[in-house]
Amino acid sequence: MSQTKCSSPSGQNGGGGNLTWWQLSLMGIGCTIGTGYFLGSSIGIMMTGPSIVISFVLAALGTYIVFNVLAKMTAEDPQKGSFCAYAKKAFGHWAGFSCGWNYWLSNILVMGSQLTALSILSRFWFEQVPLWVFASGYAILAIIVVLTGTDGFDKVENILAVVKVAAILMFIIIAGATLLGWLDGDVKKPGLPDSTGDFFHDGFPGFWSSLIYAFYAFGGIEVIGLMAMQLKKKEDGPKAGKVMMFVLAAIYVVSMGLAVTMVFQGAFDDKESPFVTALDDYHLPFFPHVFNGAIIIAGFSTMTASLFGVTKLLCTMSEDGDAPLLFSKKTKKLKDLPLASLGLGAAGLLASIITALLMPGKIYEYITTAAGILLLYNWLFIIISSLKVLKQKIWSKVFSVVGLLLILASISGTLAEKTIRPGFYVSILLAVIIGIVAFFMRKVWKRTETS
């Protein structure tokens, strides 16, 4: 079997790619819109009511700051390891190692929960089919997409992005029609909130706790950081990020705003998409089926993006000495795919599925909540790394600090809600375990540097 190292064809980190900025923007939208938005946002609405719109605005701002500094670092110093390479450059080997394995572990856990959600949603049509059959089918499909290589992944994500945006626009159009009185329903609309109590349903604690779910809806930008290496012009990264975040923020805020003005806060259910809930009483028999399909597509898309991301990053980590050399081998017959890296990701995915199906529901919820928080820890590292790596003007640094504060607010907000508080503690435990491994790896790194 012919194999090569996990390097770009040119052998340089800064080698030219074939993506235009708008393709990266579209891919970013595809990799971001997922179950966190279509399903998780219901929990945020239940916690804070109409003020979830403000939560999404703040999350969009925080996410834009993260992507903007990541794109700037990529344009200035293109690295295949993306945020891990910049953390290593800023703080040393331990930081790159910790970021990489933190990203790998959190994504594997999140993918397991996504597969479980997709399987449950699929039983909307096929009640008798066991969950494990759907989970296995979606996992195999995701692996096939990754096996098609970067070009195949790009095409699939771009197509799915269009489908997801179309579904959201369909909701916005239908919701607008109901508010204008063009569609009749058996429900009294709450309309715009006329008091602070109506807007912030559970006061500041509820709003604070809802931030984490707004940030979850923007999860996935790390993959775009990795894909930014494929841009024809690396300096177009910030432009791609601005367009991506503007589109995401616009459709998120408008759709959320419409949903919370159509039905009362008590109608929302954490097991149902808020958009389906909003149109439940408008006699649209096709809508639950269409939107259920859209949610499945969204979840599959983000899960595939995560699998692609962990496969790509583990390959680079192997080259940097942060994973066994086996994972840096690429197979020419399979479009230069790091097969061992994909295999480990698939094995982790299988373990995560089994855990999701066998473990008591609440315990697994804590683990998946922790996985989402771990991803935000990486976002913190991205911003902190940029403060050391980039030469920025004072206002750019202030902007970065604002991003730090927003992410810290979302993470700490989990302490204000007892149902998700254990997830915060689990995230600390997992981060400490990664830190301990990094501490003991110092001897290995010293030996490597000496030799």
What is each stretch, according to the model?
Residues T178, A371, L375, I384-S451:
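A generic transmembrane alpha-helix motif of multi-pass inner-membrane proteins
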Residues S2-Q3, S8-S10, A85-K88, L115-A135, ...:
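Helix-loop-helix connectors at the membrane interface of multi-pass transporters/channels
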Residues N102-L115, G225, M229-Q230, P288-L325, ...:
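Membrane-helix boundary/coupling elements in multi-pass transport proteins
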Residues G16-L19, L39-E127, L131, M244-V253, ...:
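Extracellular loop-to-transmembrane helix junctions
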Residues M1-G40, M47-T48, Y64, N68, ...:
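Membrane-interface "cap" regions at the ends of multi-pass membrane proteins
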Residues W132-P190, G241-F246, G372-F381, Q392-G403, ...:
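Membrane-interface loop-to-helix entry segments
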Residues A85-A87, G92, F124, V243-T304, ...:
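TM-loop-TM module centered on a large, flexible mid-protein loop between adjacent transmembrane helices
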Residues Q3, P9-G15, E127-P130, A161-G293, ...:
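Helix-loop-helix junctions that connect adjacent transmembrane segments
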